[in-house]
Amino acid sequence: MTDFQFSKVEDAIEAIRQGKIILVTDDEDRENEGDFICAAEFATPENINFMATYGKGLICTPISTEIAKKLNFHPMVAVNQDNHETAFTVSVDHIDTGTGISAFERSITAMKIVDDNAKATDFRRPGHMFPLIAKDGGVLVRNGHTEATVDLARLAGLKHAGLCCEIMADDGTMMTMPDLQKFAVEHNMPFITIQQLQEYRRKHDSLVKQISVVKMPTKYGEFMAHSFVEVISGKEHVALVKGDLTDGEQVLARIHSECLTGDAFGSQRCDCGQQFAAAMTQIEQEGRGVILYLRQEGRGIGLINKLRAYELQDKGMDTVEANVALGFKEDEREYYIGAQMFQQLGVKSIRLLTNNPAKIEGLKEQGLNIVAREPIIVEPNKNDIDYLKVKQIKMGHMFNF
């Protein structure tokens, strides 16, 4: 179905809020499966029967960590060997059920799981409903249907639990594209991807909070250092602010990814330290601006992996080839945290100091208004010239040498 368009996440959330079933698919390089999803508060016999009839997979009940703790739903096994670490608990039936297997009795069990008065002793173990514990942080931590189910219920303003069921084709294999698309159209069912849900959360959830603000005299001039912490990961970042940002318009700004070797050691294997110095100098001269110092060492792969990549580069690989050889993308960085930091600082539009087109696109995707790109001009040296040429040729960086 070449003309097929996925639903808007907002429409999927509204359908969940109304008690409807939606269809959600994950990445092609993961399970590459579609699941039916609905909220546990609407685990009606009709919804369960639909899942059993058309999905034919295992009907599970994704729940938050809080619900699992409240009801003493413990992991099914001590050592999880599932390919995707799906967090099954011991299966359960509510004590008011008989065999527990009918759509009506599975409905009772699922709805009792989200009953405010429910307690651990209300459930028999084992049973016919299979709770799955979602990771804290949801699809931003694990891109699974378990997390998607709980995230969608939360975004719909409902209890943090739901139902999910894999969809099999008539021949018993897992239904994939384009058959999933055809099914969604035939049943007028909202259909989204987990990637869409991730992007929605990055744009709409508050994922970073400001902790402190202090004066920061530097060799470039006096700045104000604003500390931030990511809500999910606890990762810490800093914004160095110069001048008055009250109107928030056309602020000279840079996102600088942490580079211990370049920023602190003065390494000549990269131009990071030079770029940081140039940006600080330009903002000081301007009298107004922001540098976000993000903890994204080694284009997001971390310090040790960056040094491992250097080892591979010493053996003949370039910076892109080395990252890929270690199992990473050429650039693992994302900029939604930076965009939220700018927003919390009151920045509305920026003149971005960068040579990297991915930063421009990453910030634009988060709704930040970039009115101009200001180049960072540094002189290459004999140790980083090949590295810079690779970034120019393979990653599209905009250099003038």
Swiss-Prot record:
GO terms for cellular component: cytosol. Keywords: GTP-binding, Hydrolase, Lyase, Magnesium, Manganese, Metal-binding, Multifunctional enzyme, Nucleotide-binding, Riboflavin biosynthesis, Zinc. Its EC number is 4.1.99.12, 3.5.4.25. Its cofactor is Mg(2+); Mn(2+); Zn(2+). It holds the Pfam family DHBP_synthase. The active site is at 331 (proton acceptor), 333 (nucleophile). GO terms for molecular function: 3,4-dihydroxy-2-butanone-4-phosphate synthase activity; GTP binding; GTP cyclohydrolase II activity; magnesium ion binding; manganese ion binding; zinc ion binding. GTP binds at residues 254-258, 275, 297-299, 319, 354, 359. Pathway: Cofactor biosynthesis; riboflavin biosynthesis; 2-hydroxy-3-oxobutyl phosphate from D-ribulose 5-phosphate: step 1/1; Cofactor biosynthesis; riboflavin biosynthesis; 5-amino-6-(D-ribitylamino)uracil from GTP: step 1/4. It catalyses: D-ribulose 5-phosphate = (2S)-2-hydroxy-3-oxobutyl phosphate + formate + H(+); GTP + 4 H2O = 2,5-diamino-6-hydroxy-4-(5-phosphoribosylamino)-pyrimidine + formate + 2 phosphate + 3 H(+). Coiled coil: none annotated. Residues 1-203 are annotated as: DHBP synthase. This is Riboflavin biosynthesis protein RibBA. The keyword Cell cycle does not apply.
